[in-house]
Every structure is written in structure tokens, then in C-alpha cells.
């Protein structure tokens, strides 16, 4: 009898557990209600008394998907030109998380004061539409790419030691703008990065850019080869899949543009590689290439490695140039 009671108790316990978990698994999950609205309605809600720049990634992604929802409890991140009259009043507006920026006529970039110790800079050259004083970037993915590369990194010299501006930085910026217009995010490398690192300037020589292979625009290369680009193709070496390096010219200025490739080691670690400058066939390998930062060279914004000393040491290993790192 005792055995029968134990067996009955065991079966009842199993039955209760099965019923309980079946109830959990079959009960629909009730998600928090989301008030979906037209994106124009959301932007109308965000309209400000003075011009502002929408820099909130979540809202920008909603606009790009054309699937917006109202979150009145969340502060939306906006950029505000701090020189505007009454700009300080937006700090008290519960709708906004305000990030002040400086828009100097002497530079080609906007400078954001994220915190006391954190500065970010993005190019001024981006298309936007205005909705109720809210400036909304047209190419949202490009704008987000600008912001992801916006952490400011200064060179090693003190400001009072930096040489006077030269036309070289203007020429370099013009070349960079053409690449950006073609959907790429070029960054300085080679001796151009080295010159910035040790002198905070650029020099009249053949400049050096790199572009991630995954970010390279094949249509740009095709237009170059057809002579349908603002740039002139001077030389091409290798293929896109195997260390492509090209030399391009804008007026009298030339630049090498190399591709940076990503690979996985057998242990799963990431390495990057490119082919050497001057069309040499040797391969230059880098440890995991870090996120990119921005820097100012005589009023122009350029993207660079966030650890330039490490990158220079890897690229110029066993040469005299590592003395500067």
C-alpha cells in the first residue's frame, strides 16, 4: 500500500509540473504597448524653437526603416550650435538630451562637446532635410559612420609647436571628399599617418589612404577605369580580392589608395593585412585594427587609427621610422 501511495504521489507530481510548464509555454507573451506613429508625426513632436541636428541613433534608424514610435519618456539626443541665441533653454526641455557643438568657419567639421573630456568631430558635408527646425541627415548610414569615427585624437605635438597650414592639407582633404562622396570611409596610413603623428601636418608628396575592403566601392573603380570620375587613375596593381592598390590624381596631387583586409586566425583571433606601398608585393600585417578616430589637420578633418603609434610600428617594423613611436 505504501508503495502504491508513493507511486501515485510521483505521477501526480509529474502531472502538475507538465501542466504548469504547458501553461507557461502556451500563454502568449504580452509585450509592452508601443505607439507606432508616422515618422513625420514623431518629427513634429520633436520640433524645436531653434535649429537642431538629430544625432540619436535609435530615432535615425527608425526613420530609415520608416517605422517610428513615440517614446515620450525617453530623451532624444540632439546637437545644438552653442552660439545660437536661447540655445541654453533646450537644456531644460524634457524631450531632449542636448549635445552642444561648435561650427567654426575656419574648419570643415562640426565639433561636439560630449563631456568635459570627450570631444567628437564629424564632417560638415552631409545632406539633410529640415522638419520643424530639426535637421535630419538624408544618408543616415553615412551619417552614423561619421559619428562612429568621431572620437577626436590629437597628434603628439603641443598646439604652439604645430607648423603653419600648407596647401598639402587642402589637397589631401579634396581627395578625401571624392572618396566620401563615393560612399567610402578612407583613413590615413603609411607616411601620411607618420607625418601627422610626428609633425601634426602633411607634406607635398604622394599621400596614403586605406579603405576597408568591405567598404570599397566597386563602381568607383569602374568609373575610374572608364575616365568617368573626378579623380584620374594613374596606376592599378593587383585585384580587389588580392591586395588592390591604386594611385589616383586630382589636378597635380596624387595618392595611393590601398585596401585593408580582415582575416581570422585558426584560434579565432582577428588580423588585418594590406599590400605594401609603392606597389611592392610584400604583405603588411596588423593586429586587430581598432575603431577609427578623427583628427584635425589645419582645419580639415581626417580619419585615423585610434592607436596610431601601434599601427606605425607594425607598418614600419625594423625601419628608422619606429624611432618616432
Curated annotation (Swiss-Prot):
Task: Name the domain of life.
Answer: Eukaryota
The annotated topology with respect to the bilayer is:
Single-pass membrane protein
Entries under InterPro entries matching the protein? FKTN-rel (IPR009644)
Q: Which subcellular locations apply to this protein?
A: Membrane
Q: Does the keyword GTP-binding apply?
A: no
For this UniProt record, the keywords arranged alphabetically read as follows:
Membrane, Transmembrane, Transmembrane helix
Instruction: Kindly list the residue ranges recorded as spanning the membrane.
Output: 10-30
Q: Name one GO cellular component term.
A: membrane
Q: Please give the biological process terms from Gene Ontology that the record holds.
A: protein glycosylation
Please indicate if the UniProt record lists Transmembrane helix as a keyword: yes
**What name appears for this protein in its UniProt entry?**
Uncharacterized protein W02B3.7
> Could you read off the lineage of the organism from its UniProt record?
Eukaryota, Metazoa, Ecdysozoa, Nematoda, Chromadorea
